[in-house]
């Protein structure tokens, strides 16, 4: 899962949106660094990552990537899952529009930015103003996201080429997401993540 799905699952679980979004920018044990509710959000994010990576359907999704891109497929899939969530938001979350959800999330996160790492503050400077989470619904934007990640981290250069697997296997990947994500939603609602 990437930013949007982590925020959505956090909201369903009544977990800290800030903690869930911040988690990738926090190394090691966050205890003592942040208030307990943010620590709980960071820990939920980590559990979601482990759970997602071990799902049989996600393991199946990785098989759609050739050997050249298999190493980066977990990252590519995390971004793709956000694409499918944004694309199917109205179906999956009929009681709240995506713009309304994002406005709420932003209001929960931005007031706390001064107390977060500089890299996280930098991300937030673009995430909201450029409407990244809404634009995840646009497949060309996903290609841009993967290219940008590849440009910033040379060790992940294969991310740019991994978009080919998305184009080639879009429908089966979408079907896998629409099968496993509603289950994760229920688990979040029942605080089983």
Swiss-Prot record:
Protein EC: 3.1.4.14
Molecular-function annotations in GO: [acyl-carrier-protein] phosphodiesterase activity
Record carries keyword Isomerase: no
Disulfide bonds: none
Superkingdom of origin: Bacteria
PANTHER family (UniProt xref): ACYL CARRIER PROTEIN PHOSPHODIESTERASE
Sequence similarity: Belongs to the AcpH family.
Protein name, UniProt field: Acyl carrier protein phosphodiesterase
Lineage: Bacteria, Pseudomonadati, Pseudomonadota, Gammaproteobacteria, Enterobacterales
UniProt gene name: acpH
């Amino acid at each position: 899962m990437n930013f949007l799905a982590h925020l959505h699952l956090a909201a369903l679980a009544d977990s800290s949106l800030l903690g869930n979004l911040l988690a990738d920018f926090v190394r090691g044990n966050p205890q003592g660094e942040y208030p307990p509710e943010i620590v709980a959000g960071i820990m939920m994010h980590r559990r979601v990552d482990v759970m997602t990576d071990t799902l049989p359907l996600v393991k199946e999704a990785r098989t759609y990537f050739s050997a050249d891109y298999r190493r980066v497929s977990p990252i590519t899939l995390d971004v793709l899952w956000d694409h499918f969530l944004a694309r199917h938001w109205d179906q999956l979350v009929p009681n709240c529009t995506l713009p309304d959800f994002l406005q709420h999330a932003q209001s929960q996160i931005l007031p706390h930015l001064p107390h977060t790492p500089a890299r996280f503050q930098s991300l937030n400077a673009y995430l909201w103003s450029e409407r990244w989470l809404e634009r995840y619904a646009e497949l060309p934007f996903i290609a841009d996201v993967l290219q940008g990640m590849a440009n910033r981290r040379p060790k992940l250069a294969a991310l740019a080429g991994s978009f080919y697997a998305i184009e080639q296997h879009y429908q089966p990947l979408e079907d896998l997401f629409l099968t496993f994500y509603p289950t994760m939603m229920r688990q979040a609602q029942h605080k089983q993540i």
